[in-house]
Amino acid sequence: MVNQKIQLICETESAVQFTALCQQKGLIHDPDSYLALVQTKVEGQVRLELRKLDEPKLGAVYVDFVTGTMAHRRKYGGGRGEAVAKAVGIKGNYLPTVIDATAGLGRDAFVLAALGCKVRLVERHPIVHLLLQDGLKRAYADVEIGTMMQANMQLLDIAHIQELNSSEEGADVVYLDPMYPHKQKSALVKKEMRIFQHLIGADLDADMLLEPALLLAQKRAVVKRPDYADFLAKKTPHFSHQTKNHRFDIYLKT
């Protein structure tokens, strides 16, 4: 994806660094866009945010593994009982290596990394990639989780898992969570999803991810879907884990 138009706003002194980052990803400043990528400073820390300027009440979308929701989930969440942990097959001493092929904001990957899995992340949208890269940079520098994050979460500088060599760069598990149109009225959808849908839309070519995922996966491919969605690529999984709103479809390597 090249030459993505979006408002580029720098609220810090390091405008040169911000401009270089944006140029690297082919981003072009569009003063008429209602979506903005913003470099700002909060409590002394520089971070990247995505804002929907025509709906300021939505707030900003950014990646934060250190504080807030993700810190709470790491400390007090379900741990190995989390649905994503069960879906990838964590059991006893077994901690699979994982490729998260549709990393997004990195939340499911973070749950797995915090449990001890080595997770490589792929994110093809340049703006989301920058948000994720920014969040990881701050997490790597954190006193409490920095060492674990550097060891267990790595963002690859590629846009698609097809760029990986299946014989040398595979993993035990390849995890897919493609964007899917929401059924609910937009007001009921979480702010991240509302902003993301304006930025990305649904992954209309998501069906094309399953085959390369199965090539890279040494043990299983896992696909997270809304409970009302069809199977990816209309391919029936070996089995599924059902949660309140989602379904994890598991495709075993046979």
Curated annotation (Swiss-Prot):
Q: What are its E.C. numbers?
A: 2.1.1.242
Primary subcellular site in the record, as a coarse category: cytoplasm
Q: Name one Pfam family in it.
A: SAM_MT
Binding residues for S-adenosyl-L-methionine: R107, D108, E123, R124, D177
Record's catalysed reaction(s): guanosine(1516) in 16S rRNA + S-adenosyl-L-methionine = N(2)-methylguanosine(1516) in 16S rRNA + S-adenosyl-L-homocysteine + H(+)
Q: Report TM segments.
A: none
- Indicate the family of this protein: Belongs to the methyltransferase superfamily. RsmJ family.
Q: What is this protein called?
A: Ribosomal RNA small subunit methyltransferase J
Species: Histophilus somni (strain 129Pt) (Haemophilus somnus)
